[in-house]
């Protein structure tokens, strides 16, 4: 059977480090506040690397895995971090230790709901095989690893009970993580996701906040079409043609979103947790109410203060922004989150999956016409 997941190394590299899509939200003239970084991606925070493995096979496999390395895949140096669940009907492993220690001590993986265990165990196997040790949990020749793996449910388009994500797919995402443009839409863990009634997936965006950068990467699988609001315009209500074939109504309240916030601003763990909370406001700008069945789980980290987990002496010296200086960082978080979600939808393409279910993408022309109707269409961004 022909597979969209190709096994030769050259093809894997293409899948794992694809450039940003030809069109993103700003290219359509969608107005956003704030100034993005050069890539308008989470990789604008120096050192971060992102990898995807995308699985599209036959009529029913529509899934994958995405990995974010806070300091790049060559580093095991933890970052200060914190997490927040806006609504907890979901999973992000490793967060008990994040809460306790204040450190993000592994790459952050995102996949489908029923592949969390495979991804977690595969990363531990990769650590053991490559003699990589966590920065906080190692004694002598031994270590114990508590990887961070998050999920959203892709069962409308993917045979999620088939658990098609295998260890080699995790290894490939790890090994081919790169800086620079980040693939969006139907890639990695976002391959089979649905966002506000349209095809969703992976999206990213960044902001410049003074001399610092703040960025978001999302796996968007939440919301109903009637909620979708872009640039203050009720886009979902205006674009009322069917976009999801026979999706059960209760599923509208049971989607989820994973949001990863990164910054190079010097923040303490309690401050990164405050950043994670602000991602909620970016999501709310688009109309989400975070329903009872939704797993809306966010994690934030700061790449400042290297070696804070392994001080050379009895005392560790770290730097931090005063709380009174966090306003621009909070604002940038909200802005980057909002745009990352829209970028996921703009990049996504129509998809047919398991049981013949079809989800169509957000129509670019219809979106532009709707924004124009409300006098909210801007000049497309220069490329």
Each PLM stretch: what is its role?
Residues 1-8:
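Bacterial N-terminal signal peptides that target proteins for export
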Residues 12-15:
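Hydrophobic alpha-helical segments of integral membrane proteins
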Residues 17-19:
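N-terminal signal peptide c-region/cleavage motif recognized by signal peptidases
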Residues 22-383:
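Alpha/propeptide regions of enzymes that mature by internal proteolysis
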